[in-house]
Structures are given as structure tokens and as C-alpha cells.
A protein has these predicted regions:
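Penicillin-recognizing serine hydrolase domain
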Residues: 1-141
Length: 141
């Protein structure tokens, strides 16, 4: 049912085996990640949640649940902290470390998908390289 739903939504190159997506056989593409991210970024509630280092939700029974975002670009105490990064998602399976970020700078938004980094820290180094390239490009104009 889940994969039928994904295909009906236009995510034709994504196959999941459980709702978490945490299965070494799960597949997706940068194109599908871009599509789902772009769709979700249309929702302000999504932007609010993914841009925070911690998020507390009130559950239907009135209790609360707090989640810690593992994207260290959002962590004020991290060497990788960047106030212009506004989310979105970390992920890792086996030895592949992935990161999808929304970067806001120069009055524009940049959606960056970095897949297959070799370590947790290298995913941030890889994206930082892209962010610095954006800065160099805009500063040379």
C-alpha cells in the first residue's frame, strides 16, 4: 500500500519496505527527494518543525513528545552551525550518510541533496563545500 501511494503521488523511483524508510533495501532518487521536499516546503508547519534543533509536539491525549533534530547545522553548539540552514533531513543506511538541507541566502532558497557521504562529519563537510561555492559565486557577481 505504501509504495502504491508513493507512485500515485508521483514518486515513481522510491520503494520503501516500512514507513520509517530505514531498510537497506529502500530506494529513492535525488529527483524524488527534491519533489517531496519541495511539496512539503509549501507547508509552513513543516518549515517550522524542520528548522528547529528540538521540536515538542502536543499529542491528542494532551501529553507532549520532544524530538531532537540530528541536523547539526541547526545546533548552536556545533562547529557546523549555520544560521542560514533551515532543515531538512539527515539519513543514513549502512555506510552512506545523507543530508537534505534548505539554505536561505541572498534572497533565495537553495535545496541541497547530498547523498553517499562516507561519515557523519563528511556529510556536513560536503554540504559546507556547496554552501561556500554559493557564497563565492554570489560574491563574485
Amino acid at each position: 500500500h505504501l509504495n502504491n501511494y508513493l507512485q500515485n503521488q508521483g514518486y515513481e523511483n522510491t520503494i520503501l519496505y516500512d514507513p520509517s524508510g530505514y531498510d537497506v533495501n529502500a530506494l529513492t532518487t535525488v529527483s524524488d527527494l527534491k519533489s517531496v521536499s519541495t511539496h512539503l516546503l509549501e507547508k509552513q508547519w513543516f518549515r517550522d518543525i524542520v528548522s528547529k534543533s528540538n521540536y515538542t509536539a502536543t499529542l491528542p491525549d494532551g501529553s507532549t513528545q520532544t524530538w531532537r533534530n540530528t541536523n547539526t547545522f541547526l545546533d548552536h553548539t556545533s562547529e557546523y552551525y549555520n544560521e542560514n540552514v533551515k532543515g531538512i533531513k539527515t539519513g543514513s543506511l549502512s555506510n552512506d550518510y545523507n543530508l537534505v538541507v534548505l539554505y536561505q541566502q541572498h534572497g533565495k532558497e537553495f535545496l541541497i541533496c547530498s547523498l553517499g557521504s562516507q561519515s557523519d562529519s563528511s556529510r556536513y563537510d560536503d554540504v559546507n563545500y556547496i554552501l561556500k561555492t554559493i557564497e563565492i559565486t554570489y560574491n563574485s557577481i
